[in-house]
A protein has these predicted regions:
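Conserved acidic residues
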Residues: 1, 17-19, 51, 89, ...
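Residue-level signal for inorganic ion chemistry
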Residues: 3, 28, 57, 66, ...
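Acidic active-site catalytic centers that drive phospho-/nucleotidyl reactions
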Residues: 6-7, 23-26, 30, 129, ...
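Solvent-exposed alpha-helices and their adjacent loops that cap or buttress functional pockets
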Residues: 11-14, 33, 47, 65, ...
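DPxDG-like acidic metal-binding loop motif
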Residues: 14-73
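An extended, acidic
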Residues: 81-208
Length: 208
């Protein structure tokens, strides 16, 4: 097997059918401040598909887990996404604090989304945000640039809970590079969120 992780980026994945995608701490800034919104994230990718995902929030006794085709679980209890429509949903996002040249696009996207939803919030740990979406506590998610180790495990948890996530223009996610991620509890909500995001990216001529 091979390993693809934040600390070492790539450890011998060429030609490997089984690859572990690992983030030892998602939400590092929260962790250093003892804010519990941070997690260890481990995914197993097999032949280009994530088949197993585990997210372990730190400072708590929580475990989110999923195996492809077997559902998503929180501390051993099966979970599912909410049924909220777009206007009643809570959206999670980020403002690109690690690349502030992109922050204006993030703020403009948030400005366009906010009037159309119940609320828009930021946690600072993508894996936790996607898992809370899977658990039905939140309803949509958008982030302009994420690494595979940020979302691979939690993304499977979300999918197995009945949610959906894609890259730009509804393209499948590529687990080998940075990408935009749009996620939602329902396909129609993802489509609407994707349309808003795409309109802002087009205005800014954002091509990544």
């Amino acid at each position: 097997c091979g390993f693809f992780c934040e600390e070492n980026h790539v450890l011998s994945i060429d030609g490997k059918e089984n690859i572990f995608i690992i983030d030892p701490i998602d939400g590092t800034r929260n962790y250093t401040r003892k804010n519990p919104i941070c997690a260890i994230s481990v995914a197993l990718e097999q032949k280009g598909r994530v088949t197993l995902g585990i997210v372990l929030p730190l400072f708590t006794d929580e475990v989110y887990s999923a195996e492809r085709g077997q559902g998503a679980y929180y501390n051993g209890t099966r979970i599912s996404v909410s049924d909220r429509d777009f206007k009643n949903g809570i959206v999670r996002t980020s403002f690109s604090s690690y690349d502030r040249s992109l922050s204006p696009i993030c703020f403009e996207t948030a400005r366009k989304i906010f009037p159309q939803v119940n609320d828009l919030r930021r946690y600072g740990a993508c894996s936790v945000e996607l898992c809370k979406l899977a658990k039905g506590e939140e309803d949509r998610f958008f982030e302009l640039t994420l690494n595979p180790w940020d979302y691979a495990a939690a993304g499977l948890v979300l999918e197995e809970a009945g949610g959906c996530l894609t890259g730009r223009n509804r393209n499948p996610l590529d687990y080998r590079k940075k990408t935009l991620v749009i996620a939602a509890n329902k396909k129609e909500n993802r489509e609407k969120l994707s349309s808003i995001v795409s309109s802002v990216l087009d205005e800014h001529q954002y091509q990544r």
